[in-house]
Amino acid sequence: MKSASKQKIIQPVDKNLDQVYQVSTMVSLLDGIYDGDFYMSEAKEHGDFGIGTFNRLDGELIGFDGEFYRLRSDGKAYPVQGSDCSPFCSLAFFRPDIYHEIKQRMPLEAFEEEMKRIMPSENLFYAIRMDGTFKKVKTRTVELQEKPYVPMVDAVKSQPIFDFNDITGTIVGFWTPQYANGIAVSGFHLHFIDEDRNVGGHVFDYEIEECTVQISQKLNMNLRLPNTQDFFQADFNKHDLAAGIEAAEGNPE
């Protein structure tokens, strides 16, 4: 009589917990494709955490703990509605793998070097959350655009800039490897909201007073492209990608 063979039971990996769900591409925003087909009613199927923008560039998206907000060009935060639509966003289920405490004042440049030191590899994707007090946070939010849309490098020229000093709140966003630049924004891409959920925006400078950092490593990216004629007919080969993203997302000073 043959003995029954023992088979190792392999538990399936839940890919949703190990991925960045990427809606459209950064290069499409550079091209002025500001109307998408991703409704925020779908967002929680793909993440409880994320950043992005809204149709017509009408505000910045920030989300964590399953709560999503629209940060408009008046600098104020508004709860997201399911009927709101996004042409570009990055979502993830946030399950921290790394915890790190910052107990001293630290400017942006020093913090980014500290993060690169503790991240296992710069070739992976990471969702990043920073909760704490900031000596300063400088943000911007592009104003709502009207058709015919101009390229993003022109749209940001009139963006309102806000300086928040000695403020407590949360910065969230993603680290994207250089090889994925153009799909998302390579390096750190971060948005801010204060602890009262009243104000915030796209972050381009900050100085930490003290904060708790949580990092969620992601090994996969799920790219969802728009099913729109604007996207189908766009010519993405005409851009100086690195220069365009720096002009659109970097420090305007």
Swiss-Prot record:
Matching InterPro entries: Acetolactate_a_deCO2ase
Catalytic activity line of the entry: (2S)-2-acetolactate + H(+) = (R)-acetoin + CO2
SUPFAM superfamilies (UniProt xref): AF0104/ALDC/Ptd012-like
Pathway(s): Polyol metabolism; (R,R)-butane-2,3-diol biosynthesis; (R,R)-butane-2,3-diol from pyruvate: step 2/3
GO biological process: acetoin biosynthetic process
GO-annotated molecular function: acetolactate decarboxylase activity
Keywords: Acetoin biosynthesis, Decarboxylase, Lyase
EC number: 4.1.1.5
Family label: Belongs to the alpha-acetolactate decarboxylase family.
Reported function: Converts acetolactate into acetoin.
Stored NCBIfam families: acetolac_decarb
Protein's UniProt name: Alpha-acetolactate decarboxylase
Protein's organism: Bacillus licheniformis (strain ATCC 14580 / DSM 13 / JCM 2505 / CCUG 7422 / NBRC 12200 / NCIMB 9375 / NCTC 10341 / NRRL NRS-1264 / Gibson 46)
